[in-house]
A protein has these predicted regions:
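N-terminal, polar/charged subdomain of small-to-medium soluble alpha/beta proteins
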Residues: 2-94, 109-156
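A charged helix-plus-loop insertion that forms the helical arch/lid used to bind
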Residues: 92-106
């Protein structure tokens, strides 16, 4: 697989997060995960399924012994935010190129499909930003714990 054609997910553990568009809150969660998703040209449904399964299985919440050993639970929340800048590359200089990012119509369809897949298996509070909008995101990170996932380098 050519490097750069990958579903990119940045997962952050939070105690609270909120996303606003033009001053209005469009998504809010308490304890849970903020997921930034970058969709590239060649991404497939199988990448979305892999990403959803991986996110819901990540054991990054503390158990009773204080060890990261538990996945996100249905009494928590997940806030998904589209972020095409995750698809940027800096192979030529300092200005990111986004030529491998999916076009907005393709990315929106796959973003919606990702939310559908995630929602089937997650019974908690699933919130989103607004696709394509300029957003302000506030979060209280827990840890911090940040996990990088990409569908074509699954060994991460």
């Amino acid at each position: 697989v050519e490097e750069g054609h990958i579903l990119r997910l940045l997962v952050r553990r939070v105690t609270e997060a909120r996303v606003q568009v033009a001053g209005s809150t469009v998504g809010h969660i308490g304890r849970g995960l903020v997921i930034y998703i970058g969709i590239e040209i060649e991404d497939q449904i199988s990448d979305l399924e892999w990403g959803s399964k991986k996110i819901l299985g990540l054991r990054i919440f503390d158990d009773n012994d204080g060890r990261m050993n538990l996945p996100v639970k249905d009494d928590m929340g997940i806030l998904v935010v589209s972020q095409f800048t995750l698809c940027g590359n800096l192979k030529k200089g300092y200005r990111p190129s986004f030529n491998k990012a999916a076009q907005p119509s393709q990315a929106f369809a796959l973003y919606e499909k990702f939310l559908e897949i995630l929602g089937i298996s997650f019974g908690g509070n699933l919130e989103t930003g607004k696709f394509g909008a300029k957003m302000n995101i506030e979060m209280k990170e827990d840890g911090p714990v940040t996990i990088w996932l990409d569908s074509h380098h699954k060994s991460y």
